[in-house]
Amino acid sequence: MAKEKIRIRLKAYDHR
């Protein structure tokens, strides 16, 4: 599922 990929992307994006 892409949900897991989105979660990882969100986590990396939240690493501002």
From Swiss-Prot:
Part of the 30S ribosomal subunit. The gene is rpsJ. Belongs to the universal ribosomal protein uS10 family. Involved in the binding of tRNA to the ribosomes. It comes from the Bacteria. The keyword Ribonucleoprotein applies. GO terms for cellular component: ribonucleoprotein complex; ribosome. Keywords: Ribonucleoprotein, Ribosomal protein. This is Small ribosomal subunit protein uS10. The keyword Cell inner membrane does not apply.
